[in-house]
Design a protein with these regions (language model features):
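Eukaryotic intrinsically disordered, low-complexity regulatory linkers and tails enriched in Ser/Thr/Pro
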Residues: 75, 85-97
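Conserved binding/recognition cores within well-folded domains
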Residues: 1-82
Length: 97
């Protein structure tokens, strides 16, 4: 059992019927969907990048253009997240690009 501050969570990622939580060097799984989590997380801090991942915007290290108008986000700690084209537009609006 973990009690984790939301600020230390880098990302949530689908893993079968579970969601994997990335923080520090831990990756526990919880029996919740990303849709369930997305409704409960602060949208100013957490962003649904694609069908498989929700990222913590405070852990974003850099952003690069990617294929077909989408973007790739490089997270502190080494994770790379491909943002879907649809979510790329939302991300640009959110970040005021």
């Amino acid at each position: 059992c973990w009690f984790v501050q939301l600020s230390s969570i880098r990302l949530f990622e689908v893993d079968g019927n579970y969601t994997k939580i990335y923080f520090e060097d831990q990756r526990p799984m919880i029996p919740r969907t990303l849709n369930y989590l997305e409704k409960r997380l602060d949208p100013k801090t957490f962003f649904r990048a694609n069908r498989q991942q929700i990222i913590n915007l405070k852990w974003v290290e850099r952003i690069e253009p990617w294929f077909s108008g989408s973007i790739k986000i490089y997270m502190k700690g080494g994770h790379e997240v491909d943002v879907s084209r649809r979510q790329t537009q939302r991300f640009k609006e959110l970040m005021s690009f």
